[in-house]
Amino acid sequence: PSLADYLGPRMLPWLDRIFHKPVEYLGCTRQYAKSNWKLYYENVKDPYHASLLHLFHTTFNIYRSNMRGRSVMDDGLGVHSIITTTPQEDDDTAGDYQKHDIATYRAGLKLADPSMLEVRREFEEQTSNNIHTLFPSTVIQQIHNTMAVRQVLPKSAGEFELVFHFFGYQDDDVALRRLRLKFVEQRRAHLHRQPVAGVADTVVAGGLG
């Protein structure tokens, strides 16, 4: 079938939302994991995992479980899905996390470079998280202004490689391109085990069972 037929009418608009104009490749990261590839692929479809594992997302209001969100499956094969979250300007969700002593929220945590949290409006609906899983092994992300295609490459029943392909748009201005590249460097720092804002790595967590 064609890509449009394979994805179906519910999924195709989300793909078109990201790839609505020419893109420019910004680089990639590669990570080898000792777990089954399906654990990672299913994990990214779980909207609760980020607030339970990732201190950076929770503390700095990129993703919290009590944000407004949606989860949509394709209406054909039932194997593709999209999850999104949209922070509300008047939401004070930090109080809920403090009240219940959630480990991934740390009120005193500050960034050396707060400009990483800047957001440029690029879409009609400015979601903070847009995670689009395309069966069998592709994930398309938009987290704030960071966009990437993730490849999940099985190597054996108990090992896989995860590749993040980062991109921007060809007409990015200098400031927007710099903002995108900051998150590419954050990802690389994380993989080299330099100090970054995170509690647990999704890939590593998959191999703990």
Task: Tell where the protein language model's regions lie, with residue ranges.
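C-terminal catalytic domain of Rieske-type non-heme iron oxygenases
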Residues: 1-209
